[in-house]
Design a protein with these regions (language model features):
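Short gly/pro/ser/thr-enriched loop/turn and capping motifs at secondary-structure boundaries
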Residues: 1-6, 43, 65-69, 75, ...
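Glycine-rich, anion-gripping cofactor-binding loops and their flanking helix/strand elements
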Residues: 1-59, 158-187, 203, 235, ...
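Short beta-alpha connecting loops at secondary-structure transitions
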Residues: 13-20, 69-74, 160-164, 201, ...
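Phosphate/pyrophosphate-binding active-site segments
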Residues: 55-143, 269-273, 278, 284-322
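A short alpha/beta connector and helix-capping loop motif
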Residues: 74-86, 204-222, 303
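Active-site diphosphate/adenylate-binding microenvironment
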Residues: 106-181, 235
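Catalytic phosphate/nucleotide-handling subdomain of diverse soluble enzymes
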Residues: 173, 177-215, 221
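Thiamine diphosphate
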Residues: 211-304
Length: 322
């Protein structure tokens, strides 16, 4: 999905759903026509299915008839190859400007921009910096907060440039996928974004990458916790933390070096910038152990089971819980 529509376009509003942008969530909630192309309407997108896009007529296009009306009942459906179907639809369209609607969405984009913390090292900062320094890279992710930041802050403009375990959510997926992508695309830069929890699950594959002399980059967003689970425990379970702390002194730099990779630990924006530039110039696997705050959260967010137009950010949450 990411990259199928140019992420640099002024009409691109970002991801939809639990960690989608406020603009996308509000836009879908207010639109009168929703064309869903090759989507499965997962729970992370729908929120509360009974309140999803209630003002819209929904047209679902998919090559697999099993997907039609599976998770939500749509008004119309077309079964077929998307490229052929869209071509046929284009033949039927008449030129329309939709000035008022586009202006309304543009106002939302101004009101609810995706911001990056100016101080300190953070996931959003690193993803935005990676995009600035390596726009044409193939991005790979593990599963968790870092995965959401990689979807939010890297502007994908081409298909098949984000490899991620979306629906299955398999921690440990990324490093092996990055090795495969780098092997298949030796002239491309491949970057795997991992959390420290995910990295532990398949870090032995660094030895494979080193043996094959693959110049992939592994960025560990190291917050010493299972960040996404901890975020839920903070927001919805009264800070009852269970089985999410990983602060046991494991040295990922030494582990990486022992497996033949170059490695750096960074704690500031400046150190990350320098380490990432060094990684881009490396001819072997390069690991960046980036230390971030354990309480960093992915914003915006929709509470599980809530309608997507009830998305909130950190300021909203603090105001509600004063």
């Amino acid at each position: 999905g990411k990259g199928a529509y140019d992420g640099t376009s002024e009409n691109y509003t970002g991801m939809l759903g639990m960690h989608g942008t406020k603009t996308s969530n509000l836009g879908v909630s207010e639109c009168d026509l929703l064309i869903a192309i090759g989507v499965r309407f997962s729970d992370r997108v729908l929120g509360n299915p009974k309140k999803f896009a209630k003002q819209a007529k929904i047209l679902q296009i998919d090559i697999d008839p099993v997907e039609i009306n599976k998770n939500i009942i749509v008004n119309h459906s077309i079964i077929g190859d998307v490229a052929i179907v869209l071509g046929k639809l284009n033949e039927k369209l008449e030129q329309q400007k939709h000035t008022e609607w586009l202006s309304h969405i543009a106002d939302y984009q101004k009101m609810y921009p995706m911001t990056i913390p100016k101080e300190g090292l953070s996931g959003p900062f690193m993803i935005a910096k990676i995009y600035e320094m390596a726009k044409d890279a193939i991005m790979v992710t593990e599963v968790g907060q870092h995965q959401m930041w990689a979807a939010q802050y890297f502007k994908y403009s081409k298909p098949r440039t984000l490899l991620t375990s979306g629906g299955l959510g398999t921690m440990g997926y990324g490093l092996g996928a990055a090795i495969g992508a780098q092997t298949a695309n030796p002239d491309k830069q491949v970057i795997n974004i991992a959390g420290d929890g995910c990295f532990r699950m398949n870090m032995n594959e660094l030895a494979t990458a080193s043996r094959q002399k693959l110049p992939l980059i592994e960025v560990i967003v190291n917050n010493h916790v299972l960040g996404m689970v901890r975020q839920w425990q903070t927001l919805f379970y009264k800070q009852h933390y269970s089985a999410t702390v990983l602060d046991d002194g494991v040295d990922y730099v030494k582990i990486a070096e022992a497996m033949g990779a170059a490695a750096r630990r960074v704690t500031t924006q400046e150190e990350f910038n320098a380490a990432f530039q060094e990684a881009l110039e490396s001819k072997t696997p390069f690991v960046i152990d980036a230390i971030v705050d354990s309480d960093d959260k992915v914003w915006p967010m929709v509470a599980p089971g809530a309608p997507i137009n009830e998305c909130f950010d950190g300021k909203d949450f603090e105001s509600k819980n004063k």
